[in-house]
Amino acid sequence: MDLRHLLLTLVLVCANDSLSASDDVLRLPQISKCRSPELETFSCYWTDGNFYNLSAPGTIQLLYMKRNDEDWKECPDYITAGENSCYFNTSYTSIWIPYCVKLVNKDEVFDEKCFSVDEIVLPDPPVHLNWTLLNTSQTGIHGDIQVRWDPPPTADVQKGWITLEYELQYKEVNETKWKELEPRLSTMVPLYSLKIGRDYEIRVRSRQRTSEKFGEFSEILYVSFSQAGIEFVHCAEEIEFPWFLVVIFGACGLAVTVILILLSKQSRLKMLIFPPVPVPKIKGIDPDLLKKGKLDEVNSILASHDNYKTQLYNDDLWVEFIELDIEDPDEKNRVSDTDRLLSEDHLKSHSCLGAKDDDSGRASCCEPDIPETDFSASDTCDAISDIDQFKKVTEKEEDLLCLGRKDNDESLPSLANTDTQQPRMSTRPENSQPWPPFADSIDAASPSAHNQLSNQNSLRNTDFYAQVSDITPAGSVVLSPGQKSKVARARCEFCTEQNFTLDNAYFCEADVKKCIAVISHEEDEPRVQAQICNEDTYFTTESLTTTGISLGASTAETPSPEVPVPDYTSIHIVHSPQGLVLNATALPVPDKEFNMSCGYVSTDQLNKIMP
């Protein structure tokens, strides 16, 4: 027991010491607030602190100064506003000029504050609060009232010097929390759905419209419906339903239901949320081959099935065609019908078929950019190329035939009696060198062409396999020989290719007649009897023209024994995998006509006359 008393004594001593220590803390005098109730006057209040020697009246002074003043001034009224206050009436109040105030004791300053009057406006509380009953509900449980009050008597609200907003707060008598309504300018505020069996407390406060600080609350107004003679009727509606318990039990039941559904449909939900990964399966291929990495066997299976081939591989058309090698070394030394068809002149003339097709047998045409339905441009190209080809081939055959005849014949008969055919004669100067006869040049050129004649004799009897007779099921083209074309006219090679060294610009008439006579057709036209050409005689264009016309007339009278048949040697377009469209070569063009002119024949005119 003694120990307990000792401990209790120590606790009391410690408590007294703490209280005395807190009392010993010095609190300096401080300005508590400054307020203007009506924006015309204002007052400032302060506290003395715990300085006992400063509690006497007049010990602490309040000094003030406006912005434009230079000296501090003492408070004009310490009595009107109460103890420890200073009142500034309208004569000392300037609304738009800032003030500075401070608490001093002789030379010691305790507190200082600066402000303007419009910032410290705190209106007085409203007065004369009252309420009236508006109506009650049909059940008699709730009622509506309207609360009224008057503005503060100090605020000049009626003249508009200051505008006030009012805030109403109410609560039940037994509650601690006040319910607030939105601030409004009106002095009448309705309250709805108040319970008739309860008593309420109402209070109101105001503030300046441009300020955020409210003034003091008014006196509390008590509202009791029993005072108005309204009896409270207990009703079943007043009994509160335990909504909170209903919400709790409902949430628990819903959670249990969801859990049961998840447990019963676990496998199906798992399939929906996490679908199974499909096993790699290829029709006709064992998945174990892919797992073991046997790619060679998989590739062999894929290659053996057409279903795994690409669409382009299945739909691609392949056309077999005839490949012609124009540079075969075995064929260079011998002349054949293939060389004739595929000679350099022939290929050059066919600009459409001049390049070799190296597309590995894929379906193609010599004119890939030209549509199949438009044959105008391609036909023109083929026709022109065929005409040039036929002319060149015909000229070469005629030259060979001419050389053959020259070699077989012993000699050309000399042209005699040229004096009787030429009306005009002229003699050469005696000092000029005699011209070698034209026939001598022909005889000199004959041995050089004899070797070609032996090789070309077989060419004239060679058939050209240029006609398509059949197309095999495999797509190959069967060619058959065409009809032999007889050359209707021959041309001497030495007349066009041999160059003469001319001493002057005229020619012997006998030499020219020899050349013209050879040009005529050898099969139907008889040989022209040659005359001996005098070295000192010349001919004119009239005699040459007469001879050319007579020879041309005799040639025209004798028809050609065989009409040349065109050979289809140019592939125009691939019509289908088993069809070809060929172009025909053009027929030979007529011979050149002699120009009718008078006078002697110059070298240029002779070149024009000689084909």
UniProtKB/Swiss-Prot annotation:
The chain crosses the membrane at residues 241-264. Glycans are attached at residues 16, 53, 89, 130, 135, 174. Residues 411-455 are annotated as: Disordered. Residues 125-228 form the Fibronectin type-III domain. It comes from the Eukaryota. Residues 270-355 are annotated as: Required for JAK2 binding. It is found in: Cell membrane. It holds the Pfam family fn3. Coiled coil: none annotated. One of its GO terms (molecular function) is cytokine receptor activity. GO terms for cellular component: external side of plasma membrane; extracellular region. A motif (WSXWS motif) lies at residues 214-218. Residues 265-611 are cytoplasmic. The soluble form (GHBP) is produced by phorbol ester-promoted proteolytic cleavage at the cell surface (shedding) by ADAM17/TACE. This is Growth hormone receptor. It comes from Columba livia. The gene is GHR.
